Amino acid sequence: IDTTKIVMLAETDIVEAVAERLRRYQVQNVVLDTVMLAKSGDPLLSPDAVVALREHLLPQVSLITPNLPEAAALLEAPHARNEQEMLEQGRALLALGCEAVLMKGGHLENAESPDWLFTRDGATRFTAPRIHTKNTHGTGCTLSAALAALRPRHPDWAATVAHAKAWLSAALAQADTLEVGEGIGPVHHFHEWW
């Protein structure tokens, strides 16, 4: 197994069991998509599960991918309102023991969508123009899946993030061509083929 992706672990016992297995089997290249809140802002994890995630799982994973509300929940801090606060929170998350943190800045009110990658070597900014589409359902999940899929092909997380973010930007740019259902639709995962 080259890479593992973990998504929403709602209960403390599940978080602890996954953390124990990661330790036991010394799993490498683990991407944790920190799904913790519904779009409405309602918590999807119990408070105890958030503590277990922070204390037991984060030190076992290679990369976490929080958006700004998720980072705030993990740190029990206010939501970052600008890139300076993103930098502070990204560094604080890295200090919890994971190898890397990708802070996603899509919740900022910028003309571009800035993301910051934090590693022991420093911080790297990645930007892309903000794409105005109603089809954004699953964007974070899609990005973490792309990161997990691309990691074995690239020498480090910075190169992996650059390729995954470029791919996701193209998938968002083509999302309106899908015309799938009503309401918030998906990004165009297959934009490279059709």
Model-derived regions, located:
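Glycine/small-residue-rich loop that forms an oxyanion/phosphate-binding "nest" at active or ligand-binding sites
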Residues: I1-P59, L63-P66
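Nucleotide and nucleotide-moiety/phosphate-recognizing core
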Residues: A17, R23, G122, W157-A159
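Short pre-catalytic strand/loop immediately N-terminal to key active-site residues, enriched for Gly-Thr
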Residues: A123-H137
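Conserved phosphate/ATP/ADP-binding segment of small-molecule kinases
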Residues: P47-A123
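Short, charged, surface-exposed loops that flank catalytic or proteolytic processing sites
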Residues: H79-M86, P152-A162
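Glycine-rich beta-alpha junction loops
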Residues: A10, M36-A38, E70, G105-L108, ...
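Charged C-terminal helix
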Residues: A158-W194
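Short, small-residue alpha-helix embedded
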Residues: A72-A73, K134-W157
